[in-house]
């Protein structure tokens, strides 16, 4: 993603909120609709306005001499602002203050900043702003939140973010700075960090998960919903709560009802409501939250009972994408160029999906869609830049929602359209705007789902109610363990309650393209391993990042033709193998006894039965050669071979094989 370089420079994703706060119009969070969070404390920053000083140094702050100073000529309010001037791009000293945050609590942090000629640095790591970081009791860095910074010359602007301090954090600091290798002058003032309270409760629909669509017949089915309660912030610790769930028709008649009591320490629960036979119609699912006879609030969702889903593209109960009535497994690429030469190459390689950043204002989207159609490619169309204030927002005199409306109305009926891409790693502060976008597009185009990609793994649950498909983009090579892919995939599936599909963005690029330094791209074995990990842990789609980086080398220089060809050959080989697995992935049944991690976390395995065959997907994430003896679910399986035809042993109800370091493979067993 464009903004992914912040991840690499910051080394860890943002750590934020505790629970999803549903902000859909029909599922407002209980406890206040006017704001996502409410301030519940005072500013914990000492001398955030820089009015107190001693010997020219602002009280409470660590301000490096020669860079930071009080400035009476530039204050947002009061007498002083803090001036931060850097002329040496290698002088990376910071203004800091340790702040008394409570682990597990949620805070709103904000800073007013003014800038003059702030420039240079990596194009992905520029500007003036602030961050919040935390460490353990020994001072070891654990993570942080890094709001977007501002570049150039500009008057006072406010930067803010919401952050949940992880429970393991012991020291928390706020940092004022210019990003690494930037020069220029910034002024800071009115720094605030204030504890905020989330709404009382929120809801996530688990079944039906896709837009409230429930297929007939309904008798014997259940509505399932996850309810989360913020007890501590609302003074409810130790108090039993009663949750009454009910399905009503348009006239308010009760059709099914259930009651569940949450004891004083329970903060979330899964409610299930048995259904009678329902006629196709719209219904209301309501959860009342009570303490004694007093109702604290209610949560509501619409349920639409239908005989069949009419949408051209939708997500079914197995989390598969259904396109024109048939299951579809997206194998795609992020790309920039869309000339026929590139689309022909991508299609010939076996990809079926593309996601292009480059089509927006000033382009010809219809021609792009027609080219994709010509080569049999489905398009995830990006509207991810249509948020005012973001780096690539088109300044054409229209709001983001107006731009989105224009593009959706223009393209919603095109046969090449697969889904809408509404978010590329935007932080949780954008959730209200993401929800507006999601609701608008859903109302204009009920025929296509919406997709977003995030690296903020602890926060994924927060986005549950403003997406149909969740994506994650783990890029471990070279600085992180390769099983980051399986960790992120599993975490995303858990965050989506195993109810909404997760697509994974495998890494096929070299980080040095963005960061500079020594080149170190993933090897063929590493790339294949990452694809396999995603599939083994339940990904329902793969959109690799990125085609355009295959043409680049360190520092975004053009790669030699032979380097591109080598990279492309490796990617094509992986995709050819994945395509052989697609029928089993779409139509097969998982084997519970063949799911998980073996050999002390080194080998990841998934078993799928399909058409009297047993497919066993394996990924060795270690640098060791491993001799594997895998017990089979029954002794009926007699022979085994890999997808390339190599035979393996089946002995005494066990599959016996050797896995090379980082090897990923599939064994197909027959009876």
How would you label these PLM feature ranges?
Residues 651-671:
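C-terminal beta-strand-rich structural cap/linker in extracellular carbohydrate-active enzymes
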Residues 518-573:
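Aromatic/acidic polysaccharide-binding cleft in carbohydrate-active enzymes
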Residues 294-347, 451:
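N-terminal carbohydrate-binding accessory modules
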Residues 403-433, 437, 454-460, 464-476:
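Active-site groove signature of glycoside hydrolases
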Residues 340-400, 406-407, 430-449, 482:
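Aromatic-lined substrate-binding rim segments of carbohydrate-active enzymes
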Residues 598-635, 662:
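Carbohydrate-binding surface patches
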Residues 493-525, 552-554:
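Active-site clefts of carbohydrate-active enzymes
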């Amino acid at each position: 993603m464009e903004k992914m370089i912040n991840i690499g420079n910051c080394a860890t994703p943002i750590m934020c909120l505790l629970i999803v706060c549903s902000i859909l119009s029909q599922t407002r969070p209980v406890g206040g609709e006017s704001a996502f969070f409410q301030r519940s404390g005072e500013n914990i920053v000492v001398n955030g306005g820089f009015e107190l000083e001693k010997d020219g140094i602002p009280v409470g702050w660590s301000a490096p001499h020669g860079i930071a100073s009080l400035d009476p000529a530039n204050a947002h309010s009061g007498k002083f602002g803090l001036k931060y001037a850097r002329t040496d791009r290698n002088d990376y000293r910071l203004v800091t203050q340790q702040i008394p945050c409570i682990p597990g609590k949620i805070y709103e942090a904000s800073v007013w900043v003014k800038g003059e000629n702030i420039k240079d640095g990596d194009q992905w790591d520029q500007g003036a702003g602030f961050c919040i970081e935390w460490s353990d009791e020994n001072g070891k860095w654990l993570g942080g939140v890094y709001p977007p910074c501002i570049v150039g010359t500009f008057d006072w602007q406010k930067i803010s973010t919401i952050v949940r301090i992880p429970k393991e954090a012991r020291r928390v600091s706020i940092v004022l700075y210019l990003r690494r290798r930037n020069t220029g002058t910034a002024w800071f003032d009115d720094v605030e960090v204030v504890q905020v309270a989330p709404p009382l409760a929120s809801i996530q629909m688990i079944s039906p998960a896709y837009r409230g669509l429930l297929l007939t017949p309904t008798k014997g089915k259940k509505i399932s919903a996850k309810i989360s309660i913020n007890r501590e912030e609302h003074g409810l610790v130790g108090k039993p709560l009663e949750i009454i769930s009910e399905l009503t028709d348009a006239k308010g008649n009760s059709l099914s009802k259930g009651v569940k009591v949450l004891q004083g320490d329970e903060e979330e629960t899964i409610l299930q409501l048995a259904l009678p036979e329902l006629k196709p119609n719209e219904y209301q699912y309501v959860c009342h939250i009570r303490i004694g006879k007093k109702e604290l609030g209610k949560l509501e969702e619409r349920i639409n009972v239908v005989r069949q889903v009419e949408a051209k593209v939708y997500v079914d109960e197995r989390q598969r994408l259904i396109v024109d009535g048939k299951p579809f497994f997206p194998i795609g690429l992020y790309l920039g160029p869309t000339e026929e030469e590139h689309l022909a190459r991508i299609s010939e390689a076996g990809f079926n999906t593309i996601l292009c950043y480059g089509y927006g204002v000033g382009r010809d989207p219809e021609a792009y869609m027609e080219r994709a159609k010509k080569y049999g490619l489905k398009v995830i169309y990006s509207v991810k830049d249509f948020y005012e204030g973001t780096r690539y927002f088109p300044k054409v005199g229209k709001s983001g929602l107006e731009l989105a409306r224009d593009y959706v109305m223009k393209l919603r009926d095109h046969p090449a359209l697969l889904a809408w891409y509404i978010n590329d790693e935007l932080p949780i502060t954008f959730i209200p705007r993401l929800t507006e976008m999601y609701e608008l597009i859903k109302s204009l185009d009920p025929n296509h789902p919406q997709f977003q990609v995030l690296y903020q793994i602890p926060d994924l649950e927060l986005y549950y109610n403003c997406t149909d498909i969740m994506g994650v983009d783990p890029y471990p090579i070279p600085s992180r363990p390769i099983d980051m892919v399986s960790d992120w995939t599993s975490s995303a599936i858990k965050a989506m309650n195993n109810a909404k599909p997760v697509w994974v963005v495998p890494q096929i690029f070299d980080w040095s393209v963005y960061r500079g330094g020594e080149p170190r791209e993933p090897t063929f074995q590493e790339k294949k391993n990452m694809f396999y990990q995603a599939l083994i842990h339940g990904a329902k789609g793969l959109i690799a990042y990125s085609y355009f980086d295959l043409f680049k080398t360190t520092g975004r220089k053009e790669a030699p033709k032979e380097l591109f060809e080598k990279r492309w050959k490796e990617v094509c080989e992986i995709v050819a193998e994945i395509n052989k697995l697609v029928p089993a992935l779409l139509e097969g049944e998982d084997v519970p006894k063949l799911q998980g991690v073996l050999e002390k976390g080194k080998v990841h395995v998934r078993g799928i039965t399909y058409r009297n065959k047993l497919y066993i997907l394996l990924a060795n994430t270690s640098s060791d050669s491993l001799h594997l003896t895998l017990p089979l679910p029954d002794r009926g399986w007699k022979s085994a071979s890999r997808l390339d035809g190599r035979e393996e042993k089946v002995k005494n109800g066990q599959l016996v094989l050797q896995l090379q370091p980082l090897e990923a493979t599939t064994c197909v067993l027959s009876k």
